[in-house]
Design a protein with these regions (language model features):
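Secondary-structure junction motif
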Residues: 1, 84-106, 170-178, 188
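Central regulatory/effector-binding core of bacterial HTH transcription factors
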Residues: 1-48, 115-116
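Short loop/turn segments at beta->alpha junctions
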Residues: 23, 77, 117-118, 136
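A ligand-binding cleft/hinge motif common to bilobed small-molecule-binding domains
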Residues: 42-50, 105, 119-147
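Flexible hinge/capping segments at coil-to-helix
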Residues: 47-86, 172
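Short beta-strand->loop
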Residues: 51-61, 137, 144-159
């Protein structure tokens, strides 16, 4: 929707976009290698030449197969997941530290069955009842036969950042889009 709104301004209607998706690490590597002008991603430590600007948040939820007995619930205490198998983000994912911290702060050592990089892979494995997962509350969830459970404790949100390389020249179109993103951010 962001690009569509950007194109509504007639001054921006001729600007073309190429979109790529991947893990935070891969996207930031591509940004540093000048494959991308900007990246929307999670924050990643030790990227000193990258400028991270928070632009929005996403609530974290637990997703379970509709075949899982937990699907009868609407919300869940993380302690109730002690005996579940987890489909988990890989160490390359920008979400991994946030989810690790969520479990660590609740003294839970998740029983990780699979580690994957993409949201769609996680949702697909949960859909076939291989395990449960903690994921951002994204529209893609609705394309699977899953039940979303609100997390009772603690409320954690993923912050999405716009990442650019510090002190790198940005063409006017990129500069204009970056300003548009910042002006339309809804960080809370």
């Amino acid at each position: 929707h962001l690009i569509q709104h950007f194109h509504f301004d007639k001054n921006n209607s001729k600007i073309k976009f190429t979109l790529k998706q991947g893990s935070t690490s891969a996207l930031l590597d591509g940004l540093e290698e000048e494959k991308y002008d900007l990246v929307l991603c999670s924050y990643q430590e030790n990227r000193n030449n990258i400028n991270f600007v928070p632009i929005t948040t996403e609530e974290l939820v637990v997703v379970v197969s509709k075949l899982n007995p937990l699907a009868l619930k609407n919300e869940i205490d993380l302690q109730e997941l002690q005996n579940e198998y987890f489909i988990y983000y890989s160490k390359h994912s920008g979400l991994r530290p946030l989810i690790d911290d969520l479990f660590h702060s609740n003294n839970i050592d998740p029983n990780i069955l699979f580690e994957v990089e993409e949201d769609s892979a996680i949702l697909g494995l949960v859909d076939i009842n291989y395990g449960v997962a903690v994921v951002p509350n994204i529209p893609m969830i609705d394309h699977f036969h899953l039940k979303k459970l609100k997390i009772k404790n603690p409320q954690k949100k993923r912050i999405i950042y716009m990442a650019t390389v510090k002190n790198r020249y940005a063409p006017p179109a990129v500069h204009s889009f970056c300003n548009f993103i910042v002006q339309n951010s809804n960080i809370d």
